[in-house]
């Protein structure tokens, strides 16, 4: 439960980035003030593409009941509801990995205690970026998107991303998934009935930019999709992977883990049997939440 402290290396990273460039919303300000007022250990949840912060609502309840205070900030300009998101898809366009990372960075630095952070998919990449800046007391990256230095590109991951990557113009667009695309990329490990319910309840359009950034990260030394895996202030990290995940398969999680093992802090990986990319929101979400909670509890 330490205050946020930033060593010289971390400070240089922050100085060179456009930290907090996005406006923090009134709702996010309320979350920050509430967390600080409780005096409890904060946990910050970071969603990925095609989901909203509300995808963490049940997780927040679990962690609050365990004695933490929680925040689930938006990506910049996220609508509050799925219906609003579907009605105004253009607000998602052109959101990059760097912009979103800096937005969460600005939120975290306003907390009086260094938080634990948990992210899913591109949120799993973002929490590793934030931990690499020394801003996390303990981190869980669930089915994380790849970063520079992570080389595997399984065919299922390419197929999942192809609705975006198949057209270069999508780099600057907001892209929705059809039900069939969502079924393959997110909901392949659940029943047809549950898959359709998940699609209706959670799926929203997403920025195409992060997928292009991740896909080209190993070709671009200046990419925003990079992680400082050696910062001694990174803190403990758990990477989890759903066994049946088509979007971020085990090969990507394992390669991310191997890169993160360069760090001196605790680094662990867990494969969760029979789970797909929707593992944080489907009927088995509680299993993943409990694995994450058990890891966080060991350190804060």
Model-identified regions with their sequence ranges:
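Conserved alpha/beta-hydrolase
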Residues: 63-87
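Short beta-strand/loop motif that positions the catalytic acidic residue
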Residues: 233, 239-241, 245
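Serine-hydrolase catalytic-loop signature spanning alpha/beta hydrolases and amidase-signature enzymes
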Residues: 50-58, 70
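Catalytic active-site module of serine/aspartate enzymes centered on a nucleophile-bearing elbow/loop
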Residues: 263-300
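Gly/Ala-rich beta-loop-alpha elbow adjacent to hydrolase catalytic centers
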Residues: 118-123, 127
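Conserved alpha/beta-hydrolase "acid-adjacent" motif
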Residues: 246-255
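Active-site glycine-rich loops that stabilize anionic/oxyanionic intermediates
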Residues: 48-51, 121, 243-244
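Flexible "cap/lid" loop of the alpha/beta hydrolase fold
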Residues: 136-171, 212-219
């Amino acid at each position: 439960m330490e205050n946020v402290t930033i060593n010289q290396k971390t400070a240089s990273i922050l100085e060179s980035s456009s930290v907090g460039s996005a406006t923090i919303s009134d709702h996010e300000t309320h979350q920050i003030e509430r967390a600080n007022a409780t005096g409890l250990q904060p946990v910050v949840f970071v969603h990925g593409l095609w989901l909203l912060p509300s995808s963490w609502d049940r997780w927040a309840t679990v962690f609050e009941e365990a004695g933490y205070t929680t925040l689930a900030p938006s990506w910049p300009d996220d609508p509050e509801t799925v219906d609003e998101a579907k009605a105004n898809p253009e607000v998602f366009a052109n959101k990059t990995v760097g912009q979103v990372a800096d937005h969460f960075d600005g939120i975290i630095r306003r907390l009086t205690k260094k938080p634990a952070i948990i992210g899913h998919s591109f949120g799993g990449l973002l929490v590793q970026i934030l931990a690499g800046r020394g801003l996390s007391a303990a981190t869980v990256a669930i089915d994380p998107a790849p970063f520079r230095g992570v080389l595997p590109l399984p065919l299922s991951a390419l197929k999942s991303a192809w609705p975006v990557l198949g057209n270069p113009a999508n780099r600057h667009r907001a892209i929705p998934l059809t039900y069939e695309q969502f079924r393959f990329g997110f909901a392949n490990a659940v029943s047809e009935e549950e898959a359709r319910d998940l699609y209706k309840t959670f799926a929203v359009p997403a920025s195409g930019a992060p997928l292009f950034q991740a896909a080209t990260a190993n070709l671009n030394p200046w990419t925003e999709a990079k992680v400082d895996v050696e910062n001694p202030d990174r803190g403990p990290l758990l990477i989890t992977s759903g066994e049946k995940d088509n979007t971020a398969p085990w090969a990507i999680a394992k390669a991310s883990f191997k890169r993160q093992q360069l760090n001196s802090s605790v680094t662990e990986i867990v494969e969760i049997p029979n789970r797909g990319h929707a593992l944080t929101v489907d009927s088995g979400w509680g299993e993943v939440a409990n694995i994450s909670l058990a890891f966080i509890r060991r350190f804060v």
